[in-house]
From Swiss-Prot:
<feature type="binding site">
    <location>
        <position position="165"/>
    </location>
    <ligand>
        <name>ATP 1</name>
    </ligand>
</feature>
<feature type="binding site">
    <location>
        <position position="296"/>
    </location>
    <ligand>
        <name>Mn(2+) 2</name>
    </ligand>
</feature>
<dbReference type="GO" id="GO:0004087">
    <property type="term" value="F:carbamoyl-phosphate synthase (ammonia) activity"/>
</dbReference>
<keyword id="KW-0436">Ligase</keyword>
<keyword id="KW-0055">Arginine biosynthesis</keyword>
<dbReference type="Pfam" id="PF02786">
    <property type="entry name" value="CPSase_L_D2"/>
</dbReference>
<dbReference type="InterPro" id="IPR005479">
    <property type="entry name" value="CbamoylP_synth_lsu-like_ATP-bd"/>
</dbReference>
<dbReference type="GO" id="GO:0005737">
    <property type="term" value="C:cytoplasm"/>
</dbReference>
<keyword id="KW-0067">ATP-binding</keyword>
<feature type="region of interest" description="Carbamoyl phosphate synthetic domain">
    <location>
        <begin position="536"/>
        <end position="917"/>
    </location>
</feature>
<dbReference type="GO" id="GO:0046872">
    <property type="term" value="F:metal ion binding"/>
</dbReference>
<dbReference type="InterPro" id="IPR016185">
    <property type="entry name" value="PreATP-grasp_dom_sf"/>
</dbReference>
<feature type="binding site">
    <location>
        <position position="206"/>
    </location>
    <ligand>
        <name>ATP 1</name>
    </ligand>
</feature>
<feature type="binding site">
    <location>
        <position position="809"/>
    </location>
    <ligand>
        <name>Mn(2+) 3</name>
    </ligand>
</feature>
<feature type="binding site">
    <location>
        <position position="767"/>
    </location>
    <ligand>
        <name>ATP 2</name>
    </ligand>
</feature>
<comment type="pathway">
    <text>Amino-acid biosynthesis; L-arginine biosynthesis; carbamoyl phosphate from bicarbonate: step 1/1.</text>
</comment>
<dbReference type="InterPro" id="IPR006275">
    <property type="entry name" value="CarbamoylP_synth_lsu"/>
</dbReference>
Length: 1024
């Protein structure tokens, strides 16, 4: 193919069902294209990604992934081709839109990889069904519908239960199971609202059938390889993104396996796939029937998992195939021994486990066909039990495995059985407790139809746990079944140190994709008790600890810092390893560092690795966010060499009591605060300070269980929950200052000098910094306040002997008040690095390797030359039953950013980059039931009334839901937390993809920016 320049479309902000796996696949594609000498142009407003760093793409555009912006990029750049398969559903839909609008034809841009007709055939439920039937590939009894009435008719014909699936959408958005006509009518409007083309498929629900998935690659010459077979432990009806998944497939007969493989290959041929795709197949547990359910003609969450599970670099190979290579011409870069037509063989088992945040959002529903999980982890072991228990620890919910943790201990039999029946998140822990209390595997199978093979694995774990509790010590058996030292110690009534001294050490094994069939030199490692000898690899100088499972508050920003820091160390000539277990990420890719340990981030595992690597290795804990903070004290205690800031400084900053005393000693102001060790004491102290008060437990991230209490009842209600987070630590009560401006400083220090960037938030204090709209350089803050913020950050860096990254948060009112300091990489460091043009991780690497910053001045303040705005991405539409709101708890799942020569331009481009935001053209619903926000929302309504028809709930009465459903309201602006009054309004807005603005200050700023745009303000399309 004669391609000189290619346009790659990213996936934008991280949201439920579209996460960091597209940073991984996009980064790999950019590398593969660059190897061929092709110039790459990337459009992706996700500032936190690695792919938007200078070293991967030739040009990067931080702009919304919408047709008018993409058309301008094409006009300016004139690419020869466009790659649609590496940015998830967002990129595919954008490509189809550009094609249908005639933009690609107008500029002569070719689609590389799967053709647009193939994409449509895969994503339209109607076209998919027709194509499969024509090709003789079995599909479930089903029919497409273009209206709710048609859907109801089809369901009557098929008979209940039915599952409704949505065309052209992401992660099963809007999909649901209906067991009656009433249930169908209640949710069908949301399904249509979630479809880009207003089409759904009504399908007979294959209850209890097995669901498996094949990752398949195909070249332009019709050569096909079925790379990995993955099996969902949960049966049909639970979205594959919310299922626990094992690879390879474990419960299929050879005949079932071959049939499913043939169906998958038939599907990709029918849609003319070129590159990589996945096919979901349903297998009847009671008979020979199998059906093709759906396909994704692109890299997906499953393909990221399959790549990491098999050591087969799917995204890299898919990019080469898109350029016209044959499978047998592409070398597998992991093994350097095999070509892409070689199907991997696995001599280990992987278990992928999702992580949910249902508590945070107040969601109580069980799992279904619409994906709701926020992150995922992948455990690797030589037994199913080992991999599974590892995966449960990795999702970091406080459980030490399938048995022995707080959830396991507290469940009653009744609760456990209900949890299994409803597929509540983490149901395998409930199954373990039910078995522990005497329920048989057969009974559990009858309730939830999970294959007995998997239930028996849980039973084996429970049996060993019972024997440990009875004092029978067989450490080897427990370790082979994935028990941690802590689990064993607790069951035996011994200390963790005693168990460590008693047990044998794990061995290091390589993932070589060949199951040892012939030698392959890979750097992709895991630790296991299912072996006797280590696979030998040369030692490293640094072990950089990654961010682990993604969750609210920990996302791709921390992967950016892990990878960027590791790369900077490698560029300085050091040998570097990364420890991480998140299959979505770039940090768990094979070609980033000298060694990848795909394993747990825990004291036990880090000590195992340090023993293997030798005492010369320096462990770096501050790049991955909060997960590393917990390891400082226990690792330093046993003499592990830790790079950068010392453990005592971390503890001083993390412990709110110690930190406050430090601020008092240094004469730095902070909002008045007090400690409470009990609820009664808290009530008394809060009344003394005067409501409202802010409540913060010690050691949290993402604002978990932080709250503003406006009265005594709210305070008591909150504290009963907060104890769940950190029972040993008291709660801090501080005076809440809602009138100030919240701001922060990102910095790097060597304990003497500091390089820093100030950031301002649009939303007031009380909105979590991760949910705030950030502005660089500060716009409302006066110069004295910015200077004082930098002074304070410098003073703290010197006092705490910071050797590395630092983030300090402030409220500026009549003076500058410090809220908190974090001695680690912050969520905003990718933003400040890209906005200022100075890579903060390069500065961190200087301090780590040489002990000092390579700058002359004591204090350097960096500010960008343009306006930059970072906006949060919320996933309210995904979280069934959640009440959309803002507060001190973080709710956003991702972020986007853009720049502009004026503030309004930067704000609008950034805000438009988050879905489902669009500039309103006709109508707006603007209201609040919270007196604190009335004045500002009145102002916003006044600013827009010349151009838009402004509604209030009182005017519309019972018509609101209908108007939202039929897209008669362009935007909803509201504020405050009043679910008893407006739950239905906000929920319907989220379900119908209506833009929601949930803060009054932001509403005013957006109203001004809309007016600027209405009066011919220009949204420039320019590369970074």
């Amino acid at each position: 193919m004669d391609i000189k320049k290619i346009l790659v479309i990213g996936s934008g902000a991280i949201k439920v069902a579209e996460a960091a796996e597209f940073d991984y696949s996009g980064s790999q594609a950019l590398k593969a294209f660059r190897e061929e000498g092709i110039k790459t142009v990337l459009v992706n407003p996700n500032i936190a990604t690695i792919q938007t760093s200078k070293f991967l793409a030739d040009r990067v555009y931080f702009i919304p992934i919408q047709r008018q912006f993409l058309a301008e990029v094409i006009e300016q750049e004139r690419p020869d081709a466009i790659a649609c398969g590496f940015g998830g559903q967002t990129a595919l839909s954008a490509c189809v839109d550009l094609d249908e609008a005639g933009v690609l034809e107008k500029y002569g841009v070719r689609v590389v990889g799967t053709p647009v007709r193939g994409i449509k055939r895969a994503l339209s439920r109607d076209l998919f069904q027709k194509a499969m039937r024509e090709a003789g590939i079995p599909v479930p009894p089903s029919s497409p519908a273009k209206s709710p009435e048609e859907a109801i008719e089809i369901a009557r014909y098929l008979g209940y239960p039915v599952v409704v699936r949505v065309s052209f959408n992401l992660g099963g958005a809007g999909a649901f199971v209906a067991r009656s006509e009433e249930a169908l009518k209640a949710r069908i409007y949301k399904a249509f609202a979630q479809s880009a083309i207003g089409e759904v498929l009504v399908e007979k629900y294959l209850e209890g059938w097995k669901e498996i998935e094949f990752e398949v690659v195909r070249d332009a010459y019709d050569n096909v390889a079925a790379v990995v077979c993955m099996e969902n432990i949960d049966p049909m009806g639970v979205h594959t993104g919310d299922s626990i998944v094992v690879a390879p497939c474990l419960t299929l007969t050879d005949e079932e396996y071959q049939t499913a493989r043939n169906i998958s290959i038939g599907v990709v041929r029918t849609i003319e796939l070129i590159g990589e795709g996945n096919v979901q197949v349903a297998i009847n547990y009671a008979g020979p029937e199998q059906y093709a359910i759906e396909t994704n003609p692109r890299m997906s969450r499953s393909s990221a998992l399959a790549s990491k599970a098999s050591g087969y670099p799917l995204a890299y190979i898919a990019a080469k195939l898109a350029l016209g290579y044959r499978l047998d011409e592409v070398l597998n870069q992991v093994t350097r021994r095999t070509v892409a037509s070689f199907e991997p063989a696995l001599d280990y088992i992987v278990v992928k486990h999702p992580r949910w945040e249902s508590d945070r959002f107040g969601v109580t529903e069980g799992l279904g066909p619409e994906m709701m999980s926020i992150g995922e982890a992948m455990g690797i072991g030589r037994t199913l039990e080992e991999a599974w228990q590892k995966a449960v620890r990795m999702i970091d919910i406080g459980e030490p495995g399938l048995v022995g943790g707080p959830m396991f201990q507290s469940l009653t039999l009744e609760e456990a059985l209900k949890c299994i029946k409803d597929y509540v998140p983490y149901w395998p822990i409930c199954a373990a407790k039910a078995i522990y209390l005497g329920v048989s595997v057969e009974e559990i199978y009858k309730i939830n139809k999970v294959d007995k093979f998997f239930l028996n694995a849980i039973k084996r774990i429970v049996d060993v746990y019972k024997r440990l509790e009875a004092g029978e010590v067989d450490l080897d058996e427990a370790k082979v079944l994935g028990f941690s030292d802590w689990q064993i110690a607790k069951a035996l009534g011994k200390s963790v140190d005693e168990i460590r001294a008693m047990r044998r050490r794990p061995v290091v094994k390589k993932i070589d994709t060949l199951a040892g069939e012939w030698p392959a030199d890979t750097n992709y490692l895991y630790l296991t008790y299912g072996g006797q000898y280590d696979d030998k690899t040369p030692g490293v100088d640094y072990l950089v600890v990654g961010a682990g499972v993604f969750r609210i508050g920990v996302s791709v920003e921390f992967d950016w810092s892990t990878v960027t820091l590791a790369t900077e160390l490698k560029n300085r000539g050091y040998r570097v390893a990364i420890l991480n277990y998140n299959p979505e990420t770039v940090s768990t890719d094979w070609d980033i560092v000298d060694k990848l340990y795909f394993d747990e981030i825990s004291v036990e595992r880090v000590l195992d690795i340090v023993e293997k690597e030798g005492n010369g290795v320096t462990v770096v804990l501050y790049a991955g966010g909060q997960i590393g903070q917990r390891l400082y004290v226990p690792l330093e205690k046993v003499g592990v060499k830790i790079g950068g800031t010392r453990a005592k400084s971390i503890d001083m900053a993390e412990d709110r009591g110690k930190f406050s005393k430090l601020l008092d000693r240094l004469g730095i102001k902070q909002p008045p605060w007090l400690y409470a060790a009990s609820v009664e004491e808290a009530v008394k102290l809060a009344e003394g300070l005067g409501f409202p008060v802010l409540l913060r437990p010690s050691y949290v991230l993402g604002g978990t269980y932080m709250a503003v209490a406006y009265n005594k009842e709210e305070l008591i209600n909150f504290l009963s929950k907060a104890a769940k987070v950190s029972g040993e630590y008291p709660v801090v009560i501080s005076k809440f200052m809602p009138r100030g401006i919240e701001a922060e400083v990102d910095a790097v220090s060597d304990g003497v000098k500091i390089v820093a960037t100030p950031i301002e938030h649009i939303e007031p204090p009380g909105v979590h910094s991760g949910d705030s709209t950030m502005v660089l350089p500060p716009r409302r803050l006066e110069e004295w306040a910015v200077k004082k913020m930098i002074d304070i950050a410098h003073t703290l860096a010197v006092e705490l002997e910071v050797k590395g990254p630092l983030n300090v948060q402030f409220i500026v009112q009549d003076d500058v008040y410090v809220i908190e300091a974090n001695l680690r990489v912050s969520r905003s460091m990718p933003l400040v690095s890209k906005a200022t043009g100075v890579n903060y991780m390069s500065l961190v690497a200087d301090v780590l390797t040489h002990g000092r910053l390579a700058v002359d001045e004591e204090r350097i303040t960096l500010k960008p030359s343009k306006w930059w705005v970072k906006s949060p991405q919320f996933s309210w539409a995904r979280l069934r039953g959640a009440y959309p709101r803002l507060g001190p708890v973080m709710y956003s799942t991702g972020e986007v950013a853009s720049n502009g020569s004026v503030f309004e331009e930067a704000l609008l481009k950034s805000w438009l980059s988050a879905t489902p935001n669009k500039i309103p053209s006709k109508t707006a619903l603007i209201y609040t039931y919270d007196p604190h926000h009335e004045e500002l929302l009145r102002q916003a309504a006044g600013l827009l009334s010349w151009r838009l028809e402004i509604y209030t709930p009182e005017q519309l009465g019972g018509k609101i839901a209908e108007m939202l459903k039929w897209r008669k309201i362009d935007i909803v602006m509201t504020a405050g937390i009043t679910p008893e009054k407006d739950f239905h309004v906000r929920r319907t807005a989220a379900d119908t993809n209506t833009p929601l603005v949930l803060d009054s200050t932001l509403a005013v700023e957006l109203a001004k920016a809309f007016n600027w745009y209405y009066k011919n303000g220009k949204l420039e399309v320019a590369p970074w």
